[in-house]
A protein has these predicted regions:
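Terminal helix/beta-alpha structural elements that buttress the NAD(P)+-binding lobe
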Residues: 137
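C-terminal cap/linker of serine protease catalytic domains
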Residues: 100, 158-179
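Catalytic nucleophile loop of clan PA
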Residues: 19, 140-163
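Serine endopeptidase catalytic core focused on the charge-relay Asp
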Residues: 2-7, 12-14, 19-24, 29-131, ...
Length: 179
């Protein structure tokens, strides 16, 4: 499944993740709210701007969602969507990326440099609260800034999109398909 989960390019000014479901790329709407998602795939960078989304819903009321969906011709995954209603106690899996920055000191200010890369993070989650199309999860790993837009899976299908949280608190997710 992790081959279908992507992070925003290092060339981007902001962070976020998303996943490919069939020919659709799905992320959190707030990830593309301030600027495009730069998707590095197949040796090229695709620019996904919110104006090009086939579905863009950034409404945090219970019947809203925090989801952006883009059609990506030429790319395909075997992932499917799970349209079940979230219920407290449901067990989920998470896959996201964490951006790692490492500063390397040199002898002079001119020889100092930074190295950046992404590290994949996989874990489990349990739904603890449901409010319309949104749900909270306790996770087995600490998800950092930049994990927004990552998928949460139930039985190998994309069940929702991570959209927020603070360290030590439950993670907030949005259903991909609104009621």
């Amino acid at each position: 499944m992790n081959q279908f989960v992507f992070h925003n390019s290092l060339k981007s000014q902001h962070e976020g993740c998303g996943c490919l479901v069939g020919h659709l790329f799905i992320t959190a709407a707030h990830v593309v709210e301030q600027g495009p998602f730069l998707l590095d795939a197949n040796g090229e960078t695709m620019t996904l701007d919110k104006a090009d989304a086939v579905l863009y819903q950034y409404d945090r009321t219970p019947n809203g969602a925090d989801v952006a969906v883009f059609r990506i011709p030429g790319m395909h995954s075997t992932l499917k969507l799970d349209t079940a209603t979230p219920e407290v106690g449901t067990m989920l899996d998470t896959i996201s990326y964490e951006r790692i920055s490492e500063r390397q000191e040199g002898d002079t200010i001119f020889s100092q440099h930074s190295k950046e890369w992404f590290e994949i993070k996989e874990g489990q989650a349990t739904i603890t609260q449901v409010d319309g199309n949104f749900f909270l999860c306790d996770t087995s790993i600490i998800l950092k800034q930049g994990a927004s837009g990552s998928p949460v899976f139930r039985n190998g299908k994309v069940f929702g999109i991570l959209h927020g949280g603070r360290e030590g608190e439950p993670v907030a997710c949005s259903r991909v398909l609104s009621r």
